[in-house]
Curated annotation (Swiss-Prot):
Coiled-coil features, chain-numbered ranges: 21-46, 82-110, 559-619
Pfam families the UniProt entry points to: HAT_PRP39_C, HAT_PRP39_N, LSM_int_assoc, Lsm_interact, RRM_1
Protein's UniProt name: Spliceosome associated factor 3, U4/U6 recycling protein
PTM-bearing positions, type Omega-N-methylarginine: R906
Gene responsible for this protein: SART3
Chain positions covered by the region annotation Mediates interaction with PRPF3: 2-351
Tissues expressing this chain: Ubiquitously expressed.
N-acetylalanine, modified sites: A2
Sequence segments annotated as region (Disordered): 1-36, 50-90, 590-694, 878-898, 920-948
Compositionally biased residues, Basic residues: 602-617
Molecular-function annotations in GO: histone binding; protein-macromolecule adaptor activity; RNA binding; U4 snRNA binding; U6 snRNA binding; U6atac snRNA binding; ubiquitin-specific protease binding
Region (Required for interaction with USP4): 487-520
PROSITE patterns membership: RRM
Amino acid sequence: MATAAETSASEPEAESKAGPKADGEEDEVKAARTRRKVLSRAVAAATYKTMGPAWDQQEEGVSESDGDEYAMASSAESSPGEYEWEYDEEEEKNQLEIERLEEQLSINVYDYNCHVDLIRLLRLEGELTKVRMARQKMSEIFPLTEELWLEWLHDEISMAQDGLDREHVYDLFEKAVKDYICPNIWLEYGQYSVGGIGQKGGLEKVRSVFERALSSVGLHMTKGLALWEAYREFESAIVEAARLEKVHSLFRRQLAIPLYDMEATFAEYEEWSEDPIPESVIQNYNKALQQLEKYKPYEEALLQAEAPRLAEYQAYIDFEMKIGDPARIQLIFERALVENCLVPDLWIRYSQYLDRQLKVKDLVLSVHNRAIRNCPWTVALWSRYLLAMERHGVDHQVISVTFEKALNAGFIQATDYVEIWQAYLDYLRRRVDFKQDSSKELEELRAAFTRALEYLKQEVEERFNESGDPSCVIMQNWARIEARLCNNMQKARELWDSIMTRGNAKYANMWLEYYNLERAHGDTQHCRKALHRAVQCTSDYPEHVCEVLLTMERTEGSLEDWDIAVQKTETRLARVNEQRMKAAEKEAALVQQEEEKAEQRKRARAEKKALKKKKKIRGPEKRGADEDDEKEWGDDEEEQPSKRRRVENSIPAAGETQNVEVAAGPAGKCAAVDVEPPSKQKEKAASLKRDMPKVLHDSSKDSITVFVSNLPYSMQEPDTKLRPLFEACGEVVQIRPIFSNRGDFRGYCYVEFKEEKSALQALEMDRKSVEGRPMFVSPCVDKSKNPDFKVFRYSTSLEKHKLFISGLPFSCTKEELEEICKAHGTVKDLRLVTNRAGKPKGLAYVEYENESQASQAVMKMDGMTIKENIIKVAISNPPQRKVPEKPETRKAPGGPMLLPQTYGARGKGRTQLSLLPRALQRPSAAAPQAENGPAAAPAVAAPAATEAPKMSNADFAKLFLRK
């Protein structure tokens, strides 16, 4: 904030010495100076009223008429104005929208956007009472941003009339400064408190506000300066001998802190002070300048980056943590949270630092409370809050209420509810004095366990189709408490019986856990009984359970017990081995069946190939049948340019063309088609081949080249059509479309740019629709050198802010779905999943602004009907793809090394063509007989499809008789 009026002329010179500022920072500085001038007049007027005419206003550069300018400025800034509508229809429309928003909030009170829209409309309509209530309701649920608080404060200041209203505004300021660290709100608070200096205790109130503001944001490198100067401005306006020392003290405190514009502050102090500046102050000032140089790189990184600047703040936090100043660490965390309030990990790190280092009750609990208000969907924040309240001795009733709020927070996973219940049950267990046989706390703990099991079964299973606790961890903990702390093994056994009936009886580790509990707190009889049941039920590791049973009987059992145990284990293991053998035989049969099918397919392909070869020999004039027609995957309706229409008419003479009619569809309409004679077609194909020279791939240009695929095969002149698209990314050197031997476009090409940044920008055009198909754009990579290189632009892990929607009608458009999703939050991105032909698959991914909106959307949209289709909505969490195992070679008996058949990450592909040499696929056969002599080894009989059967003398005789 600016200095006194007489030093305002030196501001430009001081500003030139300041550190670098971004454009936004310069605007803030200008705004701060404007507020400082208003503050000067407000301070002068208030001091005049307090001290009377004895104070010389002209000496301080303030006129008497400026006394009420602060109130006028505040009113002009914040007054919403009187909106006059030209049409009553618009006002009625706003009223209907207000009613709709109120109804929506009655259904879902956690809809942040609805609160904001309702406040905006009520303020627009001038409903001051209703807008105040709406703001209060929102502030109880969510922390408000600096803009929302300033708007609310300005409205309340403009309506304040007397001292009672001023106290109400003070209370509002106190709430505002608790949500986030806001230098502008503290500045407004100080300015407003100056206006009440004439009231009883007004002077002490102003100083208290400014001192608290300095404690909160006085260390702020870029915005703390305004508060220091505002405080000095206030003290300088009160001309008393005792106050001069106060101004000296403020100057010395400020100069000892590394802040921007320190040189200007030092120059101002030299000009203001009549005495020489003490040496200790100069030393502290020089030390602060040195510290400023260390902080400048981090501050400059923040100024140059764009919000939310999480990475820059993380680096700044790490730097402050190394230095270890608690005040500065707290400040940088608060600054980071202003822009990253929806990042749970940042809240967790901040609260963890406070829990372990500062341990100040009010500060710790305040941060935990703000954390759950900002990220209510994060169960870790709620669990940490319960622990912090217990750690600082908060009343049990308050902790219970907080836990009930956590259950209504809307967690996005079933396991989150298990975690919060476990945290609360741990707290209740620590309250119980188990030395007493019965107590109120113990009964409350047992009731909580019972309620937890019912809640997971009814509420959680109904919502997520799973309890979130398949291993029954809560019941296991309850059983341990009953057995170890309450000496109630009967209850523990009942709980374990219930655990086993929930699908856990087949797991050896569950039985061994129960056995260990019986071993520690039960008796041998129940241990033996548990192991006998385990032997009969376990299916994953029966050998281990059998070994434990035999070990127990060996050390504690009688001969009869030993015989029974041996008999049961042998019977069980024999049955298990029999089942395993049957399963292995079944699997081997399936493998053999697959191999037989593969052999049949192979034989059929060989027969087909031999037949084509025979036809080719018989009719050399016909077109080669072994040329494959390239068919687009998933696009059965698109006609390929390589296909020829059969024409029943005779072939015209050479050099002529004939106009024939070809049936165009079931309607019976015919279309005239010009058919060229074969000679011209051959000439045209030959010319196409001559016009398309082969270009060797230059791997040195891979960085400036992109590979474009999935283009329509029917695309005419790909270069002409694709060049305008890619020239938007930068200068295109050439486009190399790939054609077949017949001159047909094969659906992919290479685009070479002049600069590498253009190629990187072109990758953003991936999935862009071209002639109705999604165009794939990927980096140009030599697959022979990088066989594992894959490009997938979307995340394959859990994304809590993104939804996966299935069951959509194929006719649903992106705009229609976006309109539905917008009702539940801000949609950042929406993607309809299509196949290669561009046709929808009934799936979509919707990305929301934060996890809270996504969680609410799941609850509201799951099971919704869209165009008679019931959709399913869930948090995006794609299943893990199977990673192919590393191939290993195996050697066939008496043959060469064999390579096992391997598949990609998605399993078998559509094209089951083996690209391995035949010599590696089966035992090598002897080479066929050479042209000039016999082979080195006897030939192995080839399949019947590829070699004619051997004929006897009788067969040859029959052939001669036929003639």
